Design a protein with these regions (language model features):
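Conserved beta-alpha-beta core of the PfkB/ribokinase-like small-molecule kinase fold
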Residues: 77, 83-152
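Small-residue (G/A/S/T)-rich helix-start motifs and N-terminal tracts that mark the onset
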Residues: 1-74
Length: 152
């Protein structure tokens, strides 16, 4: 059975993130290992939301998987909530990259030409660097504009 890591948030309402990715990937017959980046009450397009940062947990999850000898066929990212998390995700790529697998980055950071609440140009620049490590990137038009430094 194929096995994939998905690294993204859990949005409690909003038809996105791990609440959508996990059942879809599992329904395809792929074992899905999750690394939650944050727990949000709603996604960031809502006017009010809570954000529980899980940055501190991410390295220890990786360390346990290394000790257990887990191997993965792909790594797929979604919403990454902080600059520090981008560095941690990059470390996941280095640790678990399968030469016959894929790294897939959804640079979830913008819509309608604007960065999500809490993100700035430094975040967009660092996300662009992370995208350069991917085999496949899945930006929307706003994210593509930021990644390529093209006007929206």
């Amino acid at each position: 059975m194929k096995r994939i890591i998905t690294i993204q948030d859990i949005s409690c309402i909003g038809k996105c993130s791990l609440t959508v990715a996990l059942p879809i990937i599992s329904a395809m017959g792929v074992e899905t290992a999750i690394v939650p980046t944050a727990v949000l009450s709603t996604h960031t397009n809502f006017s009010n939301f809570t954000f529980r940062d899980l940055t501190e947990d991410m390295p220890s999850i990786k360390d346990v998987w290394v000790k257990e000898g887990f191997k993965f066929d792909a790594i797929y990212t979604g919403y990454i909530g902080t600059l520090e998390q981008i560095d941690i995700v990059s470390d996941y790529f280095k640790t678990f990259n399968n030469p016959h697998g894929y790294i897939i980055v959804d640079p979830a950071m913008a819509d309608n030409g604007k960065l999500y609440t809490g993100f700035d140009m430094a975040f967009a620049k660092k996300m662009t660097t992370l995208c350069s490590d991917a085999d496949i990137i899945l930006p929307n038009i706003s994210e593509a504009a930021f990644i390529t430094n093209t006007p929206y």
